[in-house]
């Protein structure tokens, strides 16, 4: 038998970003990361995902850290490893659409401060919302990876994935990621999907999933055998549950096969030992809830992400209507269909979930409609894969005319205004971008930073008389 050609699988390590975002609410501090960077740099990872997603907001809001400073420190430490971030297309790292000038400047500064690979996605898979970020990444000589949100439904056939993969390659992306945020992709479906993508594109394929439904490691195995080039894994202390499969386990799985990573398990063991106390402490304080470490099979039954299920429970609990849970679960696919079958990822998951709860609690569908539901129906988030239900759209938006263009085409440049508003706090160019994304949170952080630098607490200072209590 002819020798099988070696094709080592590449690994993106998520322990510094998605792993702690998924398990401990993004609370790992920069100081907890830095001592292990040197060892992580010796592994030979394809990349370390360490920035973007919710880390930016969490740094400013909860940890009182400058996210840009974190990036610079990590860049100093990782001499041989590419650094990767997650970027929400036209939403950047926030929750609204921004003008192109903000997107371009954010990309420029991210790369200037040390990012090599930008993973760019849109919650509706509307690739018009990715164009500006991709062009900006290429202009700054970065690696533009486009991520497609994986989901199930009538619209999402193998032809759909094959076709969109080709369009992504034509856009100038350097690689393609399938982002399975809910852990819906099962092993044999992964084989079919990877093969279909390989027919549509020559780009390297990266698979990102979560262990929520218990199938993720098997899914990776079948995907790699089908030709997947890169998989996202997390060091074992912060793996499994709502996080990713464990790095060490996947390394051992492929040892001695054509997909052998060649990583050193002894070195990985030393890295894991660094994160173990962080896990123990999080369990002790309750930051890591053992519930998120279990297998949530409802995810597969209802095709709903785990985080969305827990949101529904708390919404119904608040309303004292927990007995309506089953009805809401059955209403979700109906609302999703009415809304053009979007992938269920932030913010579409929250919009569809809240609307389903209201439909059930009101006893009448679309009697009460939050403004986000209206925004989706007006096309303000972008284009869905399938058309909206016209009757539902009419009921929600009345005589208003929906937009059909790329939403950001209607947003005038915003940087000059942000520069003006942020002028009094600005100590570095990047501060304006922090302010642009999270104005109130950034302002609080800037005040905190100033107090630390001047050793003055603005809250007790008498500014009028320039006096300070001793």
What function would you assign to each model-found segment?
Residues 52-169, 176, 183-187:
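Active-site beta->alpha loop and helix N-cap motifs at the rims of alpha/beta catalytic domains
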Residues 35, 39-59, 289-299, 303-470:
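Terminal or standalone catalytic/regulatory effector modules within metabolic enzymes
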Residues 156-168, 213-229:
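Catalytic cores of alpha/beta
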Residues 1-24, 71-76:
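N-terminal amphipathic alpha-helix/helix-capping segment at the start of soluble metabolic enzymes
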Residues 120-123, 180, 226-243:
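Glycine-rich phosphate-binding active-site loops on the catalytic face of alpha/beta enzymes
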Residues 239-261:
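C-terminal helical cap(s) of enzyme catalytic domains, especially alpha/beta-barrels
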Residues 11, 19, 40, 120, ...:
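Conserved, mostly hydrophobic/aromatic
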